[in-house]
């Protein structure tokens, strides 16, 4: 994979700085979702068992380079202790005397969580002096957070120039899964891309048509593709300014022999609200006052037929307005079929992005996919074919 892992280092008695992603949703000082915390369990327990002194680095929220209580990592401590069944100490800063004092008290196998690295402006600026202050507290560095590896920040990229650097198990596992998705996949490869706007995923689409055999477009994005082909879409969400750009994507798909699939029917609502009056229409018959809010039954069947052909499936973005019933049914139906194909070994299935994870959980199949990435921006940038600064830095370390 081009970088060193925990298999390549003796950590006994070493101060190991571990970059984790504890950027979790909180409400009134309580953690609302433990998913990201659980992703690091294997790495932390392995290092603890091997006698390392673990010093955890993370950000939380966007505190604008200064301490803000609502973004403190302190509430994470109790939840993390429950997950790993080990005591976790907390330091009220990530550098300086407070951090150093807490680190000096660590025993072999001890765990310490430092306060939010974004409480310092040097973190997001990738400031050399801040990276040096972080590195001063460790003997080696482990990146276990793919979800932040698209950021050229001090605790992700800068620090790798100052300490021997390694990939943690979570990062290693994620990269191995993603490699199976687009870098070295089994074919045919099917990509499902949904969501509201083409503009947010234009680079993704342009990259995917070069890589995959079938590209399925759903969600609000599909409306813009349909409009670009002259289809009347009523009052549906559409990015009319992108018509020429979308036509170029369609032409590129033809050039690379990538089969593009768009909805052939749709569930059309007449108000944008839960339980709004709705009807099923063929794509050529969308009424003037209607809004396409979900894919229809024939579209579901077509997509499922394509998934049946897949050896590799990559999914990002819901296929309808999944947060509003009954316009979640298309996403649910396709998700359950994809999960069944994955469980029976017909395909390797990889899904990622915040809305995608939420939608698959909503469908009750999140655990049935081969790999589910909790990364948002990093997953999208990987789908765009970009080099992620945190991963590149590990390969150079």
Swiss-Prot record:
Compartment(s): Cytoplasm
Task: Give binding positions for substrate.
Answer: 21-23, 36, 59-62, 118, 151
Q: Which residues form a coiled coil?
A: none
The family database entries (SUPFAM superfamilies) matched by this protein are listed as: Phosphoglycerate kinase
Q: Which reaction does it catalyse?
A: (2R)-3-phosphoglycerate + ATP = (2R)-3-phospho-glyceroyl phosphate + ADP
Chief place of localization: cytoplasm
Q: Does the keyword Methyltransferase apply?
A: no
Q: Sorted alphabetically, which keywords does the UniProt record give?
A: ATP-binding, Cytoplasm, Glycolysis, Kinase, Nucleotide-binding, Transferase
Q: Which CDD domains match?
A: Phosphoglycerate_kinase
Q: In which pathway does it act?
A: Carbohydrate degradation; glycolysis; pyruvate from D-glyceraldehyde 3-phosphate: step 2/5
Cite the binding residues for ATP.
201, 323, 353-356
Q: Name one GO biological process term.
A: glycolytic process
Q: Which GO terms describe its molecular function?
A: ADP binding; ATP binding; phosphoglycerate kinase activity
Give its E.C. classification number.
2.7.2.3
Q: Keyword Cytoplasm: yes or no?
A: yes
Q: Which domain of life is it from?
A: Bacteria
Q: Which GO terms describe its cellular component?
A: cytosol
Q: Which InterPro entries match?
A: Phosphoglycerate_kinase (IPR001576), Phosphoglycerate_kinase_CS (IPR015911), Phosphoglycerate_kinase_N (IPR015824), Phosphoglycerate_kinase_sf (IPR036043)
Q: How does it assemble?
A: Monomer.
The family classification in the record reads: Belongs to the phosphoglycerate kinase family.
Q: What is this protein called?
A: Phosphoglycerate kinase
Question: What is the originating organism of this protein?
Answer: Bartonella quintana (strain Toulouse) (Rochalimaea quintana)
